[in-house]
Structures are given as structure tokens and as C-alpha cells.
Amino acid sequence: MPNDKIAAVGANIAEKAAMIWNVADMLRGPFKPHEYGLVILPMTVVKRFHDCLLPTHQAVLDTYEKVKKLQVIDGFLQKASGYQFYNTSRFTFETLLADPDNIESNFRDYLSGFSANAQDVLAKFDFNNIIKRMVESNTLYLVIKEFGSEKGYLGPDKISAVDCGYIFEDLVRRFSESFGEEAGAHFTSRDIIYLMTDLLLSEADLDTSSMTVYDMAMGTSQMLSCMEERIHELNSDIEVTCFGQEFNPSTFAIAKADMMIRGGDPNNMRFGDTLSEDQFPGFTFQYIISNPPFGIDWKREQKAVEAEAARGEMGRFAPGLPKISDGQQLFVLNGLAKLANKGKMAIIQNGSPLFSGDAGSGPSNIRQYILENDWLDCIIQLSTDMFMNTGISTYIWVLSKDKPAHRAGKVQLIDASHCFEPRRKSIGTKRNDITDACRELIVTAYGEFANGKVYGDKNGIYCESKVFESVEFGYNKIVVERPQRDEAGNILLKRGKPVPDTSLRDTENVPLVQDIDAYFAREVLPYAPDAWIDHSKTKVGYEIPMTRYFYEYQAPEAVEDIVARITVLEQDISAGLAELFHKEG
């Protein structure tokens, strides 16, 4: 998506956000700031439903009168409404506002007129109790009036599905901040999503008739929306079917509402914890795009995850389990389990999955599983300050089960940490954007698959590509023993073998591409001639030290320059002191 289109979406978001904050002003007092979202999120969904259905409202009422005595009426009413949902109530926001004395009963009548799938969305918000509180505080009519105003209009002729999706996400962000939650946990900005979509689709077969896309931690489902939008920009005839799972009730409700409005199958949006309550067992997908939580523990899911891991290949987590404090690698394993034989996945991670965990540990075993199956295609390091809730460096992992021949057995690393434009105004900790030009550089680097090539200007915006053999990330961790000695310096023996001195025990990481014995003879024996390897303790490990691969030596400042700078500083200080004491005298 070009920047001017993103800017237009931003303007729509800003306009609607201003209206919504006016509603927040009305709630001040009866509702605490962290409760504003309990009112505004479901009201925004209701108003979006209303404005989408308004043009066909009378047609639905007429159809309902004809078919209401039939046992199955959904199909008729959905056809009349033009959507996967409908409302058979005679009320609209306009007629609700015309009768303020009966606003509660009429509004409840209006809500009860929605189809079952829309009712399910509203149930996730616990909206009935919120309505009761608005009635008790005399704010229900005021809130409906504000949403019913011209500036509260959310119809699809003015607000596209993508626009509305980002309005929802902006609201979630604002109210998560006021609640003290992880503010960006449900929000991935469009610049990052469009980079991910272009990486996924850069080698795609666009002559196909259909594609499936899955997001395992979908939030409000904007990654799915953007992926579908991008596919249709490339080929409008492709039938895109989206699937998603989400554990937060409010964001799930928004995602399901968005899917209903876009005409997709709302049953593909499923509620539950992805790690412990997989809603898509046995499913596989052609594309997976996701930004699961990182740095979050999985204690809540521990029992279910460990039980599934014990099932071996019948489950998703057989390759290994990460440390309990960070479950992001579990989402990677979930994605790989659901990736079709020719599928491709883009998933956001922090730095931990690159190197955390020693040889033989769960995190290392997961990396080994990915690399030895040749599924890791590319890792792109983004700049810091790209997300609203964290300023740390983040990485896009691209995994493929159908690498082209020239990429087989290899992994591409792209350092795009210098490929950004500073924002004029930050959003939380998001101070940097991936512009069209930045995205083009990164996608070009990915497509060309060059080793040691810089794209852009190293004095400005650029990214750098390097290509490695997959085996280069592996190593054998060997245990080096040395013997105990008595006071006379003689080696202590037990059953004719030297007794190891645990205080002198050491380890060495020997690259998989090197012979262990040759390495030992070259790197250890010259310095410890009495040492030996305990081969029973050798373990295979994998790590991806991305920072080391792109490190550039910076020569220290010359001693002469440092001395000259210190001399100038000393002279300045001396002059300042002399002037000070001269004035005091």
C-alpha cells in the first residue's frame, strides 16, 4: 500500500478517534478511564453493523415478514441484507433517538434483532451489563446520539474494511493503555504488515484460483485483512479464505465482526488460547502471517502444552519446549504444524529465539528442527522503535516448506535495522516507519538472494543481505576434561583412567562443518596437552548470532586526537576557573 493511501487511512482514523473521545468525555465519572473501552468498543461494532445494514434495512424487514414462520430463514435474510448477518428490528439509530423516554427498551429491542452470529459478537463484550450501567448513569441516550451523528457514520461507502479495522485497532490501543495492559499487544502497524505480505507473495503462484491464510494470534484480524487486500491487488480473481484464532474476547469480537462485514465466513474466526485450545486441529494453510506475543510466559498453558508435547509427532510441540518465561517459539511450532507442504509463513519474533538456550535445550532443539528440515528461508532484522509497545529490535522470520532450488539448504539474513524513516509524531514507542522505498529495498534484497550486497546508501537508508549454509548455524558442544593431580603433580587414576578434575572442566563449541578431533588438536591440546574429550557429553546446538554476522569494526579514536581533545577541555576548565576566582577576588 503506498504511503498516500496509508496517510488517508490515518486521516480517517484521526477523525473517528476525535468523535470517540467525545463519547469518552460523556462517560467520565460513571465509568473509570480504564472502563471507557467497555462502552466504546461494542458501540463502535454496533454502529458499524448498523451503517452497513441501513441501505437494505427495509428489504430485510419485508423479507422477514414473508419468511418468519419458516424453520430456516437465515439464508433469505442474509441475501436481503447483502451480508452474512442481518437485523430484523424496526429500529434504526434515527428512530431510537426520536424516542428518548424509551431508549433502553428500544435499544435492547434493536440489539435482539441481530442474527445469531452478530449476537455472538456482542456477547463477547458482555454488553448487556454495560447497557445497564449506562442507563443507571443516564448516558445511554447521549452515547447513542453521539454515534448517530453525521461524524459518527461508519458506513462502507465512507469507511473501507481496512480503514475500519485500523479504527478498531486504534481504539484497542488507546483503551489498553488506559487499562495499563500491553498497549500494542493487539496492534501491528500497516507498514510492517505490508512488508510481511510482500515477502510472502514475492514468489507466489498468482495464477491459482484460491488461497488460504491463517493468523494464530489475530488480534482484530488486520493482518488477515491486509493479506487479502494485497492478494486481490495482484489478482482480483483469487478466492482468499481467511482463518484466525484469538484469546482476547474484545479483539476476537472485533475480528469476527470485521469478517462478517467483509463477507467472509465468520466461523473461520475462532475464540480460544492457541497454545492450549487449538481451534484448527488437522487444518493446514498455504500462508501464515502472525505477530504472536513475545516475552510472555506460558504458565497458564503449561499443562496442556506439556501433555501435547508428550504425544510426540501427533502433537505440535514434539521438537522441544522453550523456557517457561517466553512462549513465542511455541507459536512458531504451531505455525509449522499448520503449514501446508508448499506453504509459507511470516512471523514476528524478538531476538531471543535466535540464540537463547544452550545446546540440547528446548530453544536450541527447536532451531535445530527448523534448520535441519530446511524450513528457515530468511530472517529480517527491523530497526528499533517499530512497535507501539516496545522499542527493542524485532525480526521477521520467513519460513517455507517449498524453497526454490537456489535457496535450498541456505538461509538468508537481512539487516534492515537502518531501513526506516523517522515519524513526525510517535505513537507510543513507534518512532520509525517502513516507507514504500524502504519496503522496496528489503523485498528486492530478499528476491535477489545475494550474499554480501548492500541495498541503498550506507550513509542513509539501506539494508544488507548475507546468505549462509544452514549447517553453519550448528555446532557440537564438547566437554573438555583435565586430570586431577596429587601434591606431587602426578595424575590420579581410577581403573587405569585419569580422574577428571571438575574445577578444570571446560566446554568448546565446535562448528558442525569442522571435524571435532582436528579442532581439538588445533585449539585445545597446544594449551592443555593433558586434556581429553568426554564424547558421552557432546551435544548438538544451533544458534543464529545475527548481530555478529553484521558487526562492523569501528576503529577507536587515535590517541593523539584524544590527547588533543582532553588538552582543549583542560584549557577551557582552567580558563573558567580563573575567571570565576578572579570575579570572587
Task: Give the residues covered by each predicted segment.
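Non-catalytic, mostly N-terminal accessory regions of nucleic-acid modification and defense proteins
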Residues: 1-204, 268-279, 381-384, 408-415, ...
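Active-site lining segments that contact anionic ligands and/or coordinate catalytic metals
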Residues: 284-285, 326-328, 342-350, 376-377, ...
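Conserved catalytic motifs of ABC-family nucleotide-binding domains
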Residues: 297, 301-325
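Hydrophobic alpha-helix feature that most strongly marks membrane-spanning transmembrane helices
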Residues: 232, 260, 264, 293, ...
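Conserved Class I SAM-dependent methyltransferase catalytic core
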Residues: 26, 35-45, 252, 321-399, ...
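Feature representing long, continuous alpha-helical segments
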Residues: 225, 253, 290-292, 329-333, ...
